[in-house]
Amino acid sequence: MIDSQKEHQKLKITLVSPEQIRVWSETILPNGKRIGEVTNPKTIDLATNKPERNGSFCERIFGPVKSKKCACENKFGEDKKGFAFVDRKKTNDSGLCEHCGVEFMDSRIRRYRMGYIKLASPVTHIWYIKRVPSYIATLIGKQNSEIKDLVYCNLFLARPAVNKPTILRFRGLLQHGEITSWMEILVPYISGWNFVEFQERELATGGTSIQKQLIGLNLRALLNHSYMEWRKLLKNHRIQKRKNKIEKRKNFLVKRIKFAKNLIQAKINPEWMVLCLLPVLPPELRPIFVLGEQVVVESDFNKLYQKVNLRNKNLQNSFEIQGGPFYSTGDFLTLQKRLLQEAVDALLDSGKSGQPRKDHFRNRPYKSFSDVIAGKEGRFRANLLGKRVDYSARSVIVVGPSLALHQCGLPRELAIKLFQPFLIRNLIGQGVVANIRAAKLLIQRRIPVVWKILQQILLGHPVLLNRAPTLHKFGILAFQPILVKERAIRLHPAVCTGFNADFDGDQMAVHLPLSIEAILESRLLMFSHTNLLSPSNGSPITKPTQDMLLGLYILTTEKPRNISQFRCRPSNPTKKFLPEANLCFCNYDDVFIAYQKNRVSLKNPLWFRWKVVNGTILTSVDQEVPIEFQYQSLGTSQQIYEHYTIQRARSGKVLTIYIRTTVGRIIFNREIENAFLAFSKLSESPRAMPVFLNKSDTMFLMILNSCSAKQNCGKPAKRGLKYFVNSAEKILEVSLYETKKTSPFLQ
């Protein structure tokens, strides 16, 4: 549904009422007649190549085939021969032919004017039946198999309308064999049209049974009842015997609550999931061609609509059958209702309707409505979302381990093409060149000043990266472009989860936001470091990859220790103990300086002075017991644990804490602290939203300052990726060295 009354048009896919379908499909002619219902299964007359009256190509319903011409080949205001004017009284001043009833208008109306088929019996929409779990089964509270048997007339629902008097005293669902004996008794009383009245009151099947149950639903009462039941089940979660049943029931209630809440918010009635009027697409969207010698080439929709119309007409004729025993009439009507349901299923979604109908001439199944709009070649992705647009590019993605989470590597050749208008404006504005022609010549020569100005432009202009298919909002994100000399786009590996991308040849598209509103939206809402959590369940969508985790493991690994490390060595009087066994540092800077000067390795253990906070230290072991107590002559004491020591004064106050750690763990802890510090500063002192100024550079600078604190989030993962690469290089060097030693060819 496209709402064109408002300022901004929008496309909304939702359930609609039968009244709305009638409003879309019916047309009021100038003489006051209402048209729109398709009753004839035929399409065109092969003898005259003209549409059949009241058929799926009728000119009265969908408009004329030729502009300003009716079905009689008569133009508005002219005689059939084109010489004399026809009397206005015969053709109507409003432009309606009295002979064929076709309006004189533009033939393009056949592209958007719809029709409808009035179904003789309600038909359930297949999208809400064959889905697991079924929406209808969730609302009604029955199993999926029972709902399917009701829809396809294998079961009967007793007393569908409880507010009317009934003859039979059945309850619930009944099979065909259970009601056969009662049918024989009611033979003299019920037949023909009386069966319809009997069906509405006593036994219902097919779409009628589903519609009756959905009409009686009160969504708000159902929502409250489901919520109260869910609250009661929360109190019984400790019962082990029924734990699995309780969990299943809780999950079912949660789905029912969500679905009922969505229906209430969208103002949708549940009975709209059962179709009474079937919309017919405009003829131009399902064309038909006659190629001579009665060879017809037509859209699959026409065959499917024809089958629906034929079976609907058969069901209408079945209601008019008079006489005969009740059970034979009932069986015949039940069969016709099932055939109509299957025909509508094949039209809407042949993939879910079981065995799809095939075109025996071309030996392939017919394309249903779902097949046309779904998938990569469907209407949305191929025609609406798959269009080529200006200011866009495309290239292969490769990993960028040196990038921040909000950055992407943009090839220089792509950037200079995308930002060429901005380059020309800046070159002229800064006085480098005098006109556009000189600026283009300068850009073609690729002189250094061009790259310098391009760097300045990229600093305040994000780009959008998109990978098809765009299934959710993480499929297109904004990044700060960084110029690279390669021809591939560099991407941080942590954001690949949202794109569902990997580095095995995947391609991504680059789009350039042009307007000030689009750039603002990219900065505030679409940057990758501001989209870290999944909106569906709150779990992180941006997570460290396996390479990063392995690098962090290598970074924080401690060198294996044994007693030989602390053994006295009398043969070396200058170094009786290993130098790294008793190394002690007081702050981070001392550790980093010693590591840079190669005085200590990454994995060797050392003692590090820790901050005294409440005299405690968190460990992985609760209430850890000291290994040893040491008391000094001045009254101070020292408690020695497995991985740390605590020195206390005579009063019991904690003086110092030393922990046993490594340089790698200190580096990792420092990165984590910086990341948390950036988040805490951002939350404690939130900046106000920048005022919309005329100078966009000032506004973008304020937005950059407000977003810069979050850019430290990816540093720990980046550090892990760095050490993973370093370790992989060392392993590769060792393996190559061993290979050279064993292979005479490489030697």
Swiss-Prot record:
<keyword id="KW-0804">Transcription</keyword>
<dbReference type="InterPro" id="IPR006592">
    <property type="entry name" value="RNA_pol_N"/>
</dbReference>
<keyword id="KW-0150">Chloroplast</keyword>
<keyword id="KW-0479">Metal-binding</keyword>
<dbReference type="GO" id="GO:0000287">
    <property type="term" value="F:magnesium ion binding"/>
</dbReference>
<keyword id="KW-0548">Nucleotidyltransferase</keyword>
<dbReference type="GO" id="GO:0000428">
    <property type="term" value="C:DNA-directed RNA polymerase complex"/>
</dbReference>
<dbReference type="InterPro" id="IPR034678">
    <property type="entry name" value="RNApol_RpoC1"/>
</dbReference>
<dbReference type="GO" id="GO:0005739">
    <property type="term" value="C:mitochondrion"/>
</dbReference>
<dbReference type="InterPro" id="IPR044893">
    <property type="entry name" value="RNA_pol_Rpb1_clamp_domain"/>
</dbReference>
<feature type="binding site">
    <location>
        <position position="100"/>
    </location>
    <ligand>
        <name>Zn(2+)</name>
    </ligand>
</feature>
<feature type="binding site">
    <location>
        <position position="72"/>
    </location>
    <ligand>
        <name>Zn(2+)</name>
    </ligand>
</feature>
<comment type="subunit">
    <text>In plastids the minimal PEP RNA polymerase catalytic core is composed of four subunits: alpha, beta, beta', and beta''. When a (nuclear-encoded) sigma factor is associated with the core the holoenzyme is formed, which can initiate transcription.</text>
</comment>
<keyword id="KW-0460">Magnesium</keyword>
<dbReference type="InterPro" id="IPR000722">
    <property type="entry name" value="RNA_pol_asu"/>
</dbReference>
<dbReference type="InterPro" id="IPR042102">
    <property type="entry name" value="RNA_pol_Rpb1_3_sf"/>
</dbReference>
<dbReference type="Pfam" id="PF04983">
    <property type="entry name" value="RNA_pol_Rpb1_3"/>
</dbReference>
<dbReference type="GO" id="GO:0008270">
    <property type="term" value="F:zinc ion binding"/>
</dbReference>
<dbReference type="InterPro" id="IPR045867">
    <property type="entry name" value="DNA-dir_RpoC_beta_prime"/>
</dbReference>
<dbReference type="GO" id="GO:0009507">
    <property type="term" value="C:chloroplast"/>
</dbReference>
<dbReference type="Pfam" id="PF04997">
    <property type="entry name" value="RNA_pol_Rpb1_1"/>
</dbReference>
<dbReference type="Pfam" id="PF00623">
    <property type="entry name" value="RNA_pol_Rpb1_2"/>
</dbReference>
<dbReference type="GO" id="GO:0003899">
    <property type="term" value="F:DNA-directed RNA polymerase activity"/>
</dbReference>
<keyword id="KW-0934">Plastid</keyword>
<dbReference type="GO" id="GO:0003677">
    <property type="term" value="F:DNA binding"/>
</dbReference>
<dbReference type="InterPro" id="IPR007080">
    <property type="entry name" value="RNA_pol_Rpb1_1"/>
</dbReference>
<feature type="binding site">
    <location>
        <position position="70"/>
    </location>
    <ligand>
        <name>Zn(2+)</name>
    </ligand>
</feature>
<feature type="binding site">
    <location>
        <position position="504"/>
    </location>
    <ligand>
        <name>Mg(2+)</name>
    </ligand>
</feature>
<comment type="similarity">
    <text>Belongs to the RNA polymerase beta' chain family. RpoC1 subfamily.</text>
</comment>
<protein>
    <recommendedName>
        <fullName>DNA-directed RNA polymerase subunit beta'</fullName>
        <ecNumber>2.7.7.6</ecNumber>
    </recommendedName>
</protein>
<feature type="binding site">
    <location>
        <position position="97"/>
    </location>
    <ligand>
        <name>Zn(2+)</name>
    </ligand>
</feature>
<keyword id="KW-0808">Transferase</keyword>
<keyword id="KW-0862">Zinc</keyword>
<comment type="function">
    <text>DNA-dependent RNA polymerase catalyzes the transcription of DNA into RNA using the four ribonucleoside triphosphates as substrates.</text>
</comment>
<keyword id="KW-0240">DNA-directed RNA polymerase</keyword>
<feature type="binding site">
    <location>
        <position position="502"/>
    </location>
    <ligand>
        <name>Mg(2+)</name>
    </ligand>
</feature>
<dbReference type="GO" id="GO:0006351">
    <property type="term" value="P:DNA-templated transcription"/>
</dbReference>
<feature type="binding site">
    <location>
        <position position="506"/>
    </location>
    <ligand>
        <name>Mg(2+)</name>
    </ligand>
</feature>
<dbReference type="InterPro" id="IPR007066">
    <property type="entry name" value="RNA_pol_Rpb1_3"/>
</dbReference>
